[in-house]
Structures are given as C-alpha cells and as structure tokens.
Amino acid sequence: MIIRSPEPEVKILVDRDPVKTSFEEWARPGHFSRTIAKGPDTTTWIWNLHADAHDFDSHTSDLEEISRKIFSAHFGQLSIIFLWLSGMYFHGARFSNYEAWLSDPTHIGPSAQVVWPIVGQEILNGDVGGGFRGIQITSGFFQIWRASGITSELQLYCTAIGALVFAALMLFAGWFHYHKAAPKLAWFQDVESMLNHHLAGLLGLGSLSWAGHQVHVSLPINQFLNAGVDPKEIPLPHEFILNRDLLAQLYPSFAEGATPFFTLNWSKYAEFLTFRGGLDPVTGGLWLTDIAHHHLAIAILFLIAGHMYKTNWGIGHSLNDILEAHKGPFTGQGHKGLYEILTTSWHAQLSLNLAMLGSLTIVVAHHMYSMPPYPYLATDYGTQLSLFTHHMWIGGFLIVGAAAHAAIFMVRDYDPTTRYNDLLDRVLRHRDAIISHLNWVCIFLGFHSFGLYIHNDTMSALGRPQDMFSDTAIQLQPVFAQWIQNTHTLAPGATAPGATASTSLTWGGGDLVAVGGKVALLPIPLGTADFLVHHIHAFTIHVTVLILLKGVLFARSSRLIPDKANLGFRFPCDGPGRGGTCQVSAWDHVFLGLFWMYNSISVVIFHFSWKMQSDVWGTISDQGVVTHITGGNFAQSSITINGWLRDFLWAQASQVIQSYGSSLSAYGLLFLGAHFVWAFSLMFLFSGRGYWQELIESIVWAHNKLKVAPATQPRALSIVQGRAVGVTHYLLGGIATTWAFFLARIIAVG
C-alpha cells in the first residue's frame, strides 16, 4: 500500500468586493482621519492633510489593509509612469526632428519641443541643425529609440498610444485589486512565490524578451542604419520577425534556425551574440551584439534563480531557513527573526530595497559614460552630463529614503521584547562605539582632505608651486586606482581571453574612439587632483552616513531621551520644561542627512563635469590631435579651492550668465530664479516659529479691523513643517541652479 501525503488544498488568496467603490470619499478631504475629516479650524489643517494622506500606517493598524493600499497605489504609480512615457514618445512623434536626427546624428542635435510664439518666447527655438529650430533635449530618448530599432515618427505614435492603453490598464488594476479582488495578507507574505515570479518573470522573461527584440529587430535595423541606408528603405520590424530570410542575409546562421541551439553548436550564433568589449567605432556606443548577448546571459541566470525557492512543490530553498542558519562565530543569533521583520514591516522591506536601488542607480550613473550603451550617446555631451547628474541625484535621494524608512521601522515596527542577540540587537547594543568611531573618521577625513587643499591654496598664494601637492611637485598619485585601471586594461587576452577589448576605454591603453570629429571616449588619466577630490567624496559620504545612521540607531531611545520611541518618528521637542531636546527626532536626522547628501552629490557632479571637459570631451583633428573643451586644466587648477571657484564655477558660469538674448536664455532665467528659490528656503531654515506667529497675529489684527478676517485661523508653520518647507526649497533651488549652469555651459561649448 502506498501512503501519499495529502494534496495541499488550493488556498483562496483574495477577498471578493472588500471595499465598495464610492466617490463620496473624494468629497471629504481627510476622510482617513477623524480629526482631519472634521475640516479646518486653523491653517495647520492643510499641512496635516498633506502629511498624513499617504501615511497608511496612521489610517489603520490592520496590516492587511495597509498592504492592499500600498499594492493598489503601486498600480497608480505605474499608470503615471506609462502616462509620462507616452508623453515622451508622443513628443518624439509630433514635435521632434527624430527622423532628421536619425539620418545625421553627428551634425543634428536632438529636439522634441518647439516653443509657441506668444510674447517672444520663440527665441528659445535654437538651430539644432538640419534646418530645424527647437529646444535641444538631453534626455537620451533619441539614442534609446535608435538602439531599439525605431525608424519613423509613426512608430513613436503607435508606441505612445500603446503606453496610454497600458496606463489605463494599470489604473483599472489598481481599482480592481483594492475594490473587487483584494489579496489576503498571506499572499503579500508569500516570499518564495514572490521571489520566483519576480526573478523568473520580471527579470528573466523580461531580459529574454528584450534580448529577442534586440536580435530580431534592433540588430538588423541598426546594421542598416550604420551602413548609411535611408531609414525609409529599411524593412519594418514585423518583416524581420516574420521573414527569416531577411535576417539570414545579414546573419547567415539564422538560416539554420534553432538547430545549433539544440545540438549544442552554440558558436554558430557568434555572429550576433558577441563578446567584443570596447565601443563600436561607427556609433561610439557599446556593440549592440554584445548587449544582446548580455541580456540573453542575464535572462538565463534569472530564469534559473527564479526556480530556486520552495513553493507548492516541496523542493527548493526556504528563505526563513536560510536566514535562521545565517550565523557567524561573532554574530550571536545572526539573522534569526529577520524573516518575521521583513514580512510584517513594509518599512524594513522598503528600507533595504531603497538602499540597494539607490546604490544601483549610482552604479548606473558611472556606467552610462564609461560604457555608453546607446548609439551616438557618447558624443552628445549634454545628454552624457544630464544622465550622470540625474542618476547621481536619484541615487542620493533613494539612499536617504532608505535611512528614513529604517528609522520609521525602528519607531513603529521594531519590537525589542522579541529580539535578543540577533544582528540588529547586537548593533543597537554597541551603537555608541559605532557612532563615535564614525564621528572620528569624519573628523579625520574632513581635516585631512580640506587640509591638503588649504595647504595648496596657501603655497599658491605665497608663490611656492614647488611646495604644492600636484602632479608636477609633491605627487600624491592614486596608486590603487591606477593599479585597478591597469589590471582591466591588460584583461583582454589575459584574464578575459575571449574579449578583444577591455570593458571600458576609460581603463587605459592607447585606444580612442571619435565619431564625426568628436571624442566619444578615451582612457581617463587619474592623478593628484583626483586623489584630492576623492578624499572630499569620502568625507562627505561618511558625514551623510554618520547623520543617517545615528538617526536610525537612536530612533527609539538615547541617553538624552530614553523614551524617544513613544514620541514617534517626528516631533519638535520632548515637551515643555526639557530644554535642549529639540530637533532630535528620527525625522530631523533625515532632514539633516538631506543637506549632506546634497553636498556629496554636488561635489561628485562638479568633479565629473570638469574632469570630462578637461580630459575626455573635445574635438579631434584630421592629424589625430585632440583638443579638449577646457584644455586639460583639471590637473593643475582643481588642486586649490581657489581653482575650483575661479576656473570651474566662475569660468564655466559665463555661458549661463551671458545667455540672455540667445536660445539658451531660459537657462539664464532658471539660474536666477532657482537661486531665488534657494534663498527663499533660508527664510524657513534660519527663523523661529514664534517670529512668524507674532507677525501673523499683527496681520490678523489688521484684517479684523477691516472686517475681512477669514473663518480659518492663520497659524505659523510648526517647527517640523517649517524645516520641511525649508529643505524642499533648498534642494529644489540648488538642483535647478546646477541644472541651468550645467546645460547652458555644455550646450554652448559641447
């Protein structure tokens, strides 16, 4: 007799019609909170409404309901993303010079916006080449479209309409999965199933379908474009997909179909799945055949990864078991209990995801210029600078967000009674040692990194160049970085025998790729100047980490306020009668961390902008002589603070300051306006609440005199609200100022 284990019952994972659909809620602002729903007595009401509208934790303590709201909101977010994408593609279809750019990407600039003449704004429509007048864009969309095989504005139209359909679909899904079929909590907590689906589905099949698109559509179309064939003559994407003979003309192995795959004769496919390294000399981008190969390989990895976790079949990893077993000799209980944390606290989960995604975004920023993935991206200096800056800012914000949600987790979701001697508990128990050591590191880095600059400024002022730290006097070469560069340069034929060139031209070697007389990429030399500024990077990053980590580790308690957890994530002070306890909440640490994040990223993007203009970007003559935009002045000028002020900020601001009366004048106005927004922030940051309350009361008195006083009492912003408004305008003003400064400069000279 065979004894079988009983078949697992099929679990019903959704509730039907849990929340009725009604528009009545929309007419009641603050319906999620009893106090706010009563309506405004004072102007504080509108601030509380904004602060709490998306704080689902404060609406209910039911984890299932919170999870459903987050899940539904994600579909809304996706809908907005599709809507935005549709707008980008529609602009490409309706207002752009894409087809002209496609025919001559080296002499024609990308533009997808033509300004209407109302009171003279048409001055902004600059001549981007090919007889087209419009605003030069630096988003990189044209390069992506070419890489994906889009050859006409009609195709952009169709894609834009497709994205709108998807936006509507996402909007519907958000409604459906909250009001009609809402998942149960168990579904949100089914980690193994989620991993399998996300790894195999999103990343595995996603990469596989992109690889398929690249092989069947992008590669043949780009091969024709590179050979100078008129885009109108090139067969349409569906013709390549449906007609194998067309592909076989370009890649003969296509005639054999899938036979080489099943007979393990994979080298047959080396025509379109390559491992070359380096850049395509025609377009200055990575070889598209390398990119297709990469996506195929990634797809295989993720498809395997998506079959590793135990679900309905009793085979595979259990995440809980992995975490429970994760104990080292010095880590006590290790990761015991982490599984419960990550399945019951979405803040903890989000914190990890933000930290990893933020780091990844910064990695993307560094790869976009060193391994430019799209055709003609590397020679479009404005786009290169924009993409680097954009990804650095986004990465910085995501990492601060990681600290914010880690602190919210500590305050709202951490239960000290059930956590003993696991890794988190052990970190919390020696937090004083961590923070004081980190503080020492920050002081060391700060004094030494700035000390090197100040030494140079002093020696320069005294006329003693021989006593400066520079490549021509006292050298401080970044020997470790140079060793890494050299190792990568020598890799082809040695540690990477299959590759014909190293992963990036920036590592070294004699290669230079120029397209249409412009430098795409060349080896980037590192010297004393880079050594100095890298230590400023180390300093600013460590200070950011110090502030954020202190906020997380002291979110629940500190010697100053032992019961901090009871006060919540954000509070102004520990009540009246306890002086010196203001601005210690976890929220305030995020607030301060944002300023240092801004410092960190600013130094990075300034370094990048100047270094590339000095040592990489420029033109190449017929004799092969390279002339860089700023003539290689980085190595000698950036080693003093005065050099940064004079030869970078001041010298390169001339384009934005003198932009009036030209097509770049919008950047001049933005530069001015964003400085104003930034200065406006200081009013909120340097002034106390009482000052404004007194002022408001005089103004209210005047209104009462004239019998025009409003029913809703005006109130000064609370301390936290004032700081929030301040930091928002500080960052917005600073980022927009930098944006105007960079773009006016690089569009004028690049």
UniProtKB/Swiss-Prot annotation:
One of its GO terms (cellular component) is photosystem I. The chain crosses the membrane at residues 70-93, 156-179, 195-219, 291-309, 346-369, 385-411, 433-455, 531-549, 589-610, 664-686, 724-744. Phylloquinone binds at residue 692. It is a multi-pass membrane protein. One of its GO terms (biological process) is photosynthesis. Chlorophyll a binds at residues 683, 691. It is found in: Plastid, Chloroplast thylakoid membrane. The keyword Transcription does not apply. Its EC number is 1.97.1.12. [4Fe-4S] cluster binds at residues 573, 582. Chlorophyll a' binds at residue 675. InterPro entries: PSI_PsaA, PSI_PsaA/B, PSI_PsaA/B_CS, PSI_PsaA/B_sf. Its main location: plastid. It is an enzyme of class 1 (oxidoreductase). It catalyses: reduced [plastocyanin] + hnu + oxidized [2Fe-2S]-[ferredoxin] = oxidized [plastocyanin] + reduced [2Fe-2S]-[ferredoxin]. Belongs to the PsaA/PsaB family. The PsaA/B heterodimer binds the P700 chlorophyll special pair and subsequent electron acceptors. PSI consists of a core antenna complex that captures photons, and an electron transfer chain that converts photonic excitation into a charge separation. The eukaryotic PSI reaction center is composed of at least 11 subunits. This is Photosystem I P700 chlorophyll a apoprotein A1. It comes from Gossypium barbadense (Sea Island cotton). The gene is psaA.
